[in-house]
Amino acid sequence: MLIQENLSIQDKLKILTDAAKYDVACTSSGVKRKGKAGSIGNTSEAGICHSFAADGRCISLLKILFTNQCIYDCKYCVNRCSNDVVRTAFTPDEVCRLTIEFYRRNYIEGLFLSSGILYNANHTMEQIYETLYKLRNQWCFNGYIHVKAIPGADAELVERTGFLADRMSINLELPTAEGLKNLAPGKTRDKILAPMRQIQQGISVSSHLLGYDRGYKKPYSTERAGFAGGAALIRPELAGGPGAALDRTISAGTMKQGAARGMIGAAQGMAGAAQEVAGGNPLKDMHSESHVGNHSKGLKSRLVLPASQYKKSAFVPAGQSTQMIVGATPENDYQMMSVTQSLYRNFGLKRVFYSAYIPVNEDSCLPSLPDGPPLLREHRLYQADWLLRFYGFRAEELLSEDRPNFNVFLDPKCDWALRHLEGFPVEVNLAPYDQLLRVPGMGVKSASRIVAARRSGRLGFEDLKKMGVVLKRARYFITCSGRMMEGARLDQDYITNCLVGDEQRARWDIEHRDSFRQLSLFDDMHMEMPVTRDDHYAAAAGHF
């Protein structure tokens, strides 16, 4: 490890921005806060990330590491302690000056601050807290801040940082505890989930005390995968977890004593519970298990600050997120999505990010990737993640143990529809909103427009096109006034050929020679519209 001292701030910036490029930033701030007199900066709920790098990563935030020094030796990480790279660290004042100067030049709209572990978790978290405190109170920076919580840090440090940040995140790193043990032996699932639960509880108390629901409203407010505060939705046995207990306390307090007194009582009760275990090991009641959802029963409240603090300012108003590496361990897509669903439902996460594994180190435990990083797989996981959060799908609907991976040629929604043709075609003039959402080519906005527009008259295919429906996909799964679009028919092979194309279908048949498919009279592609070169490119990119 080569620790460089007396480096200029420009040299540090070059080293620590490059070291942070593998950490996934947020795609939108998720919180809206207007500017105020005496302060600079504001946050925009939709679009803090305006531009993307060539590899698709967001570059509109100042994304840096506080330090690339680290005590851990994670096999996949470029900053692992065994790597012979130049090490350096910012000071809190340097991060503040950089953020303000970049903001004044209109280079950025916010800060994304992560870090390696410098000396120990508490020391690193103290430095991050000092940085945010100075930015908010001395430099009067009112812009967006996304900060990484350090696993294993003191609960009070994490909690105080949450009142200064807009979003916090703790990287889950890998979907299973076994994978984490193999590739990141210094980290444990317990250390990662403890602050994640603490942030969830703080968000829930703060949102009820201040009267907001994490700043956004989405469909399926009580059933969708990522609804606020849900600790017991994925499995009934999780009903005894601390998140569910908090929900019950809040509900009871609201009904019996009024909203304000109920929220204060809940917060005080959780703070008292945290003080009871403060004398011992705060992780002693947590049990190491391979599936993330099972941890909810052992996690206790770790909120330390009094309820009065939660009444003054919002705690992590943009919610928390996490990141998983795709392709570094042998878990399949079904396992990845099951863990994602569990995180949304048990920990109330706002986003789960996926990062295709990029080999930066040589190690016998790491996979070889002759075809490069699994970017298409990452793309499919993001598409499925969207279906979980906004379309009412469940992981077990999209995949199963018999079909554990996503179709590389079709997006998850089209693939699901082709396997459930018994539910199609859907009559757009009569179908409920939930059913419209499951039609390929229809999104949340277009489905809402259809429901609103059909009150004043019957809709045709031209009307749907004007509303934003992608008829190239939707035409095979809908009817207007009882009629399908001209040239479309409800046949699995026909629809698959039209969506994927002859060249991609042939490739699929070669790669799946053990799969059996009944021959059809309609396999002659000369009977149908010719497939263009642009169609081949679009199918290969997953745009169909």
Enumerate the predicted regions with their spans.
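Short, charged beta->alpha transition segments
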Residues: 62-64, 93-104, 308-309
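Conserved, mostly hydrophobic/aromatic
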Residues: 61, 74, 113, 170, ...
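Canonical Radical SAM [4Fe-4S] cluster-binding loop centered on the CxxxCxxC motif
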Residues: 64-93
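Long, highly charged, low-complexity intrinsically disordered interaction regions
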Residues: 362-437, 473-526, 532, 543
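Short Fe-S-cluster ligation motifs
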Residues: 98-114, 384
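Conserved AdoMet/S-adenosylmethionine-binding subsite of the radical SAM
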Residues: 96, 119-391
